[in-house]
Design a protein with these regions (language model features):
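C-terminal amphipathic helix plus adjacent low-complexity
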Residues: 102-155
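A general structural signal for well-ordered secondary-structure junctions
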Residues: 18-19, 47, 91-92, 113-114, ...
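An acidic- and aromatic-residue-enriched active-site/binding cleft used to recognize and process polar
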Residues: 53, 79, 96-97, 130-131
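Nucleotide-sugar donor-binding catalytic core of glycosyltransferases
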Residues: 1-88, 145
């Protein structure tokens, strides 16, 4: 079975040929793990948060934390509706392949903009989606405790 993300990434690279991509785990490039993974992602400028299958409202793998936590610009399909939590100054939302390509090209040429989006996204993510806040929410929901905390996703 062919993973639709492979086709998407191959097409993205074709139409965005002036930008360097580091893509692992496809096209005979071995995946990277552990320390090598974290060292590699720390040296990237942007991260594509691309999930398997169709985009689902509010769904993301933990990849989003790795991207944003390293201060990278997070590129995410607008169908995830993460715009409900983040502005375009904190995350980059794309409509389709060509829109994503255009946004990657723009950000790759504007270092100041890239750093600003990465930093703002990281600050907001760490404030509202950090592990303590998420764990507290799970505990309160599980035990039926009335929350005194503000959860961005409960608005």
């Amino acid at each position: 079975k062919i993973d639709d993300r492979v086709t998407f990434l191959n097409n993205l690279q074709k139409i965005t040929s002036d930008v360097k991509f580091d893509i692992y785990g496809i096209n005979k490039v071995q995946p990277i793990w552990a320390d090598h993974y974290f060292k590699t992602i720390a040296n990237c400028k942007m991260g594509l948060n691309l999930s398997r299958g169709k985009a689902i409202k509010y769904y993301s793998s933990d990849r989003i934390t790795q991207i944003i936590g390293n201060g990278l610009v997070c590129l995410i399909d607008e169908k995830t509706k993460y715009q409900d939590f983040f502005s375009s100054e904190e995350m980059v939302f794309y409509k389709n392949l060509s829109d994503l390509s255009e946004k990657i090209q723009k950000i790759s040429r504007d270092e100041k903009l890239r750093k600003k989006i990465g930093q703002k996204g990281k600050l907001k993510y760490m404030k509202y989606f950090n592990s303590n806040k998420v764990a507290q929410f799970i505990i309160e929901k599980t035990l039926g405790i009335k929350s005194k905390s503000f959860y961005l996703w409960s608005k």
